[in-house]
């Protein structure tokens, strides 16, 4: 059986890793081993970051809604409960956008939630 040389394959793999390491500092972008280690670590960070981004945005939306509802005399949790009782099904992203760009419409939603809470 003939011996298989992996020169082309290894070269291709090294080029792929070094391309991913573009922009890293020092040996991490020039030499294969440190570049490979840091590329693997950076891919882990990217994976974790994609999960954290969802949490961060939800936190941001809730903070914005809370600030806007408190300006209208209601807490976030009571506001969300009032919307649920009123049968209004809007996600937090849309509510936070309304709180910023459509203050009158958001105030109407808060009033609707207040009425349903008092009823």
Curated annotation (Swiss-Prot):
NCBIfam families: rplT_bact. One of its GO terms (biological process) is translation. One of its GO terms (molecular function) is structural constituent of ribosome. Binds directly to 23S ribosomal RNA and is necessary for the in vitro assembly process of the 50S ribosomal subunit. It is not involved in the protein synthesizing functions of that subunit. The keyword Ribonucleoprotein applies. One of its GO terms (cellular component) is ribonucleoprotein complex. Gene3D superfamilies: 6.10.160.10, Ribosomal protein L20. The keyword Ribosomal protein applies. InterPro entries: Ribosomal_bL20 (IPR005813), RIBOSOMAL_L20_CS (IPR049946), Ribosomal_protein_bL20_C (IPR035566). This is Large ribosomal subunit protein bL20. PANTHER family: 39S RIBOSOMAL PROTEIN L20 (PTHR10986). Belongs to the bacterial ribosomal protein bL20 family. Keywords: Ribonucleoprotein, Ribosomal protein, RNA-binding, rRNA-binding. Pfam families: Ribosomal_L20 (PF00453). It comes from Alkaliphilus oremlandii (strain OhILAs).
């Amino acid at each position: 059986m003939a011996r298989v040389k992996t020169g082309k394959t290894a070269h291709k793999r090294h080029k792929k890793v070094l391309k991913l390491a573009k922009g890293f500092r020092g040996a991490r972008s020039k030499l294969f081993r440190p570049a490979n280690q840091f590329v693997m670590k950076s891919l882990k960070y990217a994976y974790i970051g994609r999960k954290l981004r969802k949490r961060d945005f939800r936190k941001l939306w809730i903070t914005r809604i809370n600030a806007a509802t408190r300006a209208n005399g209601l807490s976030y949790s009571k506001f969300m409960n009032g919307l649920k009782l009123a049968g209004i099904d809007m996600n937090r992203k849309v509510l936070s956008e309304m709180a910023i760009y459509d203050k009158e419409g958001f105030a109407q939603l808060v009033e609707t939630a207040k009425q349903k809470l008092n009823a």
